[in-house]
Amino acid sequence: MPNLNQFIALGDSLTEGLSDKYPDGSYRGWADRVADEMSKQDSDFRYANLAVRGKLIEQVVADQLQVALPWMQQAQTLVTFHAGANNVLRPKFEPEQVFETYKNAVAQILDTGAKLLLFTVREV
């Protein structure tokens, strides 16, 4: 695997790290922990966690993905993407629309050449 010197995390509360607290009450989620380990491999390592709790997939794409796309072209980048869970919780959830948005977002990320790690909503 090539040296990955950049990590961009996109998504909602799962990626933001909500409910994963330090003793002082501040958040430090899985993405922060992964970034800590990745930074040990490269002194020029860069990390951006753009995830925000409560965001719908359309908001993740508009507010996070579109901002991050230019940065994905600049380095050996790992991108994580988790979105759609908050859509599922809505009364008028439209799975086909969410899936289409998800597919388009994945295609945009893959077109940059970045390495992509996907997370999905757990089946219940």
Regions inferred by a protein language model and the residue ranges of each:
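Cell-envelope and extracellular/periplasmic
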Residues: L14, A51-K55, A83-G84, V88
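A structural signal for well-ordered alpha-helical scaffolds and beta->alpha junctions
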Residues: Y27-A31, V61, Y102
